[in-house]
Amino acid sequence: MKLTIALSKGRIFEETLPLLAAAGIVPAENPESSRKLIIGTNHPDVQLVIVRASDVPTYVQYGAADLGIAGRDVLIEHGGAGLYQPLDLNIAKCKMMVAVQEGFDYDAAVRRGARLKIATKYPQIAREHFAKKGVHVDIIKLYGSMELAPLVGLADAIVDLVSTGGTLRANKLAAVEHIIDISSRLVVNQAALKLKYDAIQPVLDAFAGAVPA
């Protein structure tokens, strides 16, 4: 019974390797250097598919992958339909923040009821956050270089992931509001969990035992 695990390249993959090892799964190739999108492992019945981070939940939802690892940010934007989320893996940690150009008085703008333009890759998270605060916003969906938006007058603020804050500082932006903590989660196709329980559950147990504190 073949198991397919959806992963994305980069930080999440690197921090997933010890968890895979705990489950006895070792990739046959390094996806960072391989052009292959389907990578075998030391188990003939386990394969990895390498996809964009934002596509991991979709591959799992529709059964193209049985399991996947995705950031909480991606899962919120996706909506989580058809997914079982049994485990917070405590990897790839960062924070979702509101950031503005240095010198912009965000609190004053909020207090006076200004309608703010918000640039973000995460419209669902941003919309929910500002709705809870009762702040009127126009969401501008971007796919990269969020930090540029306030500098050229496209937006008053951005909603983005912040790890060290170095990129914000380099572009004279400052984080002004914390929205949520982000880490990566293990997600499982709900139908696959029933049909392939004997194959999937040992992987879940091994991951649970290896999650960093």
Curated annotation (Swiss-Prot):
Enzyme superclass (EC): transferase
InterPro entries assigned: ATP_PRibTrfase_cat (IPR013820), ATP_PRibTrfase_CS (IPR018198), ATP_PRibTrfase_HisG (IPR001348), ATP_PRibTrfase_HisG_short (IPR024893)
SUPFAM superfamilies per the UniProt record, alphabetical: Periplasmic binding protein-like II (SSF53850)
Gene Ontology molecular-function annotations: ATP binding; ATP phosphoribosyltransferase activity
A GO BP entry: L-histidine biosynthetic process
GO cellular component: cytoplasm
EC number, UniProt record: 2.4.2.17
Location of the protein in the cell: Cytoplasm
One protein family per Pfam: HisG
Keywords: Amino-acid biosynthesis, ATP-binding, Cytoplasm, Glycosyltransferase, Histidine biosynthesis, Nucleotide-binding, Transferase
UniProt pathway annotation: Amino-acid biosynthesis; L-histidine biosynthesis; L-histidine from 5-phospho-alpha-D-ribose 1-diphosphate: step 1/9
CDD domains: PBP2_HisGs (cd13595)
Record's catalysed reaction(s): 1-(5-phospho-beta-D-ribosyl)-ATP + diphosphate = 5-phospho-alpha-D-ribose 1-diphosphate + ATP
PROSITE patterns the record matches: ATP_P_PHORIBOSYLTR
Complex formation: Heteromultimer composed of HisG and HisZ subunits.
Role of this protein: Catalyzes the condensation of ATP and 5-phosphoribose 1-diphosphate to form N'-(5'-phosphoribosyl)-ATP (PR-ATP). Has a crucial role in the pathway because the rate of histidine biosynthesis seems to be controlled primarily by regulation of HisG enzymatic activity.
Annotated domain remarks: Lacks the C-terminal regulatory region which is replaced by HisZ.
Family, as annotated: Belongs to the ATP phosphoribosyltransferase family. Short subfamily.
NCBIfam families documented for this protein: hisG
Protein name as annotated: ATP phosphoribosyltransferase
